[in-house]
């Protein structure tokens, strides 16, 4: 079943990441041709799992939800030779807005100088479920984790923070536009800015 899903994702040109729990989980997925793995925050101080993870040649996402700075530092140090992305989150379903603490993204970037991602578990039926990921883009995250379900009204497994397919497509489009809007830090003027200067700039 895993191999079929991986092959299907490759046909669609979608990267295939796996969320693992425990040593056996990461040992099992190491035999698969996947694009990356996420280590759950409950395993961030699992020395056997982390030692095994050092052998992986794929990107590793580290969930930092509910972890202290020293725990994150331990995992980052252990996996210092791996390609790491730190994932900020609050491990609650659904996450209350007051618990999001998005500014911690900036603290993680400053402390570890690594790419940062955001795992968003805000209630799927809240308008903020579309806004929080965009705030993450504004804070410089490079990966967004968002759950999807075929029909949230059926209240199946993991429906709390999941989006319906049409909502998910809309969010992807909004994320792409937000990334475009972020632009560059350069002060080099673009075509439209130059045109504005020609038409409206006043000189003494």
Per-segment meaning from a language model:
Residues 1-204:
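Catalytic cores and adjacent flexible loops of soluble metabolic enzymes
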């Amino acid at each position: 079943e895993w191999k079929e899903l991986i092959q299907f994702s490759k046909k669609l040109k979608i990267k295939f990441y796996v969320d693992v729990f425990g040593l056996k989980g990461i040992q099992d997925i190491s035999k698969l041709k996947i694009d990356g793995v996420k280590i759950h925050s409950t395993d961030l101080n699992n020395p056997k799992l982390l030692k095994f993870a050092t052998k992986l040649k794929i990107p590793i996402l580290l969930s930092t939800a509910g972890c202290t700075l020293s725990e994150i530092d331990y995992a980052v140090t252990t996996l210092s030779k791996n390609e790491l992305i730190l994932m900020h989150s609050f491990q609650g379903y659904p996450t209350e807005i007051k618990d999001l603490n998005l500014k911690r993204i900036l603290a993680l970037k400053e402390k570890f100088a690594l790419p940062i991602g955001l795992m968003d578990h805000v209630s799927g039926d809240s308008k903020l479920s579309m806004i929080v990921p965009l705030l993450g883009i504004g804070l410089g995250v490079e990966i967004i984790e968002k759950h999807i379900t075929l029909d949230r009204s059926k209240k199946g497994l993991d429906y709390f923070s999941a989006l319906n397919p049409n909502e998910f497509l809309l969010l992807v489009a909004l994320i792409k536009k937000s990334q475009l809007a972020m632009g560059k830090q350069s002060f080099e003027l673009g075509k439209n800015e130059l045109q504005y200067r020609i038409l409206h700039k006043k000189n003494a």
